[in-house]
Amino acid sequence: NIANRINAVKDWLSLPEEQRPHMITFYMPEVDHEAHTYGPNDPHVEAAVKFVDSSVNALQATLATLNLPINYIFVSDHGMTKVDNDNTLGMPKAIDTAAFRVPWGDALIHLYAKEESKIQSTYDALKKDSLISVFQLDETPDYWHYKKKDDIYQRLGDLIVVPHLPKVFNFSTRKTTLGKHGFDNHHPDMRASFMAWGPAFKKGLIIDDFENVNVYPIVAKILGLDYNENNIDGKINVLNSILQPIPSTMKAAKHN
């Protein structure tokens, strides 16, 4: 119940200052759920967007009664695109599953070689398929951050196979959903949302696209948290210009 969730936030912010949370996250799954099920341009998604919009309005109106300097950051973690779920791609014939471990995927699949001698021949065979693109790690676009130097946890496959939209992979007998994400983050449909308002933010700005990792540094700055720039991906200079000057009296807490 959205009213109960909003009232819970109000109750938390009504606590004595020493007990009051300084950051609250509030996830709303409705748009994601409907867009996966029906595709991003369906009336069900429009209704879900209107529900979220009215809920944010209700949240703001409820919290305004507390007379606190509340900042709001409204984000989505990904975009959504409509795929061809009637004609999905199965396991490419060029992939020998005895020679590769292939976990499930739809927007891309990773091929983990059991036999390194099979990598090049499989790569060459997959390159001939007009419905997909195949990459060795050092061929992937820089902005994917999918190269060997980025793979500090050794999660990436020896080969990465990407279907050409609107195609997607489906290794199941069950029909896949109409809406998907996880594709190339330069694709317009993969763009996420960002809005921010409150006393910490300048008003009326329209800004250029940026990567979501850059939200963290401004949240930390607003909260007065210190952090090691070498330990995070985001950069404060990307969004710093949207912030009002932070009072010099604000004391930074250590955040390790």
Q: Where do the model's predicted regions map?
A:
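Soluble non-cytosolic domains of exported or imported proteins
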Residues: 3, 43-50, 113-117, 209-213, ...
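Active-site-proximal alpha/beta segments of enzymes that process anionic O-linked groups
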Residues: 1-18, 215, 235-242
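Acidic/histidine-rich catalytic neighborhood
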Residues: 69-70, 78-114, 252
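Active-site neighborhoods of enzymes that stabilize oxyanions during catalysis
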Residues: 104-218
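A long, amphipathic alpha-helix that forms part
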Residues: 2-15, 31-72, 121, 219
